[in-house]
Amino acid sequence: ADITELYSTSSVAIVSSLYEGFGYPVIEAMSCEVPLIATNTSSIPELTGKYASLIEPRNHEAIIESTIKILSDYDKYKEIAIKGRQHVIENFNWAKITKEYENTIYETIKEFKDADI
């Protein structure tokens, strides 16, 4: 099975990382509209926005509590997950990232040209 199928057939995704560079597992889970529990470390809070249940790292009790909370009110958390997918589409696509990178380069060049060197 591929990763998309595994996420899509899951009721909850749990990303309990102690550190994430970019956080592909978070983006993958959100892209598949799976209610997400993730640690509030590294880049994860920035990636998830308000579309995940964030917990402290190394807190297995929080994982249990968050899982029960999601499964007890699944429709609510599924709706959040659906909105989370839209968040990923709007904020983490190559066209947007490339444009932002391009703008940063242009602004840097402009600042350098305008500098009194």
Regions found by a protein language model. Give the residues of each.
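Short acidic alpha-helix that forms the nucleotide-activated donor recognition element
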Residues: A1-S10, S31, P45
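Acidic donor-binding loop of glycosyltransferase active sites
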Residues: S8-G21, V34-P35
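Short hydrophobic beta-strand element within catalytic cores of glycosyltransferases
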Residues: V26, P35-A38
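Conserved acidic donor-binding segment of nucleotide-sugar-dependent glycosyltransferases
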Residues: S53-H60, K69-Y74
